[in-house]
């Protein structure tokens, strides 16, 4: 698992990549127990400098299993958060973000000032995301109509206004 950062949860169904800072150190942390019980037993990736900021989520004594420079992580593919676009049919239609989609990419705007050091990328909804994803040949996934309503491509939130969907996306 990677603890990714976003200020716009409604864009998560359109996630196409995760950006890291190429010179930031990241840790793979094994969570023994956490206060919520959600991550116990999991291994999560987070910027090393931010481990103390996530003590509640990572538990009292998380174990660092490995460390990596961000540049070492670039190119690693991951299973998408949502499966809406990860089907053979969607790929054939060109609706998926392409062969480089759902991978870790480098971006100079990723910092450890806030967040987790891993930044969610939805190129249809952010200029930085768009330019960075274009550099890696990652296509745009746009399941929102002109009125800001989720289309049928995102069945769980179909017909919902994007800001109304935020709380449901966060709960998922």
Summary of predicted features, one role per range:
Residues 17, 24-118, 127-131:
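Protease-associated
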Residues 1-14, 25-27, 33-35, 75, ...:
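Residue patterns forming the tRNA-binding/recognition surfaces of aminoacyl-tRNA synthetases
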């Amino acid at each position: 698992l990677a603890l990714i950062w976003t200020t716009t949860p409604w864009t998560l169904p359109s996630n196409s990549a995760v950006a890291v800072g190429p010179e930031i150190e990241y840790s793979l942390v094994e969570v023994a127990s956490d206060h919520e019980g959600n991550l116990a037993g999991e291994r999560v990736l987070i910027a090393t400098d931010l481990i103390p900021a996530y003590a509640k989520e990572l538990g009292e004594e998380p174990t660092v299993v490995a460390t990596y420079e961000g540049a070492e992580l670039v190119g690693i593919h991951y299973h998408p958060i949502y499966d809406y676009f990860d089907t053979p049919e969607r790929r054939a239609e060109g609706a998926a973000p392409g062969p480089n989609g759902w991978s870790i990419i480098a971006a100079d705007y990723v910092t450890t000032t806030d967040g987790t050091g891993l930044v969610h990328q939805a190129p249809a909804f952010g200029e930085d995301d768009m330019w960075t994803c274009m550099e890696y040949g990652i296509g745009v996934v746009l399941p929102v109509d002109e009125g800001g309503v989720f289309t049928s491509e995102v069945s769980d939130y179909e017909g919902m206004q994007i800001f109304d969907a935020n709380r449901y996306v966060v709960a998922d």
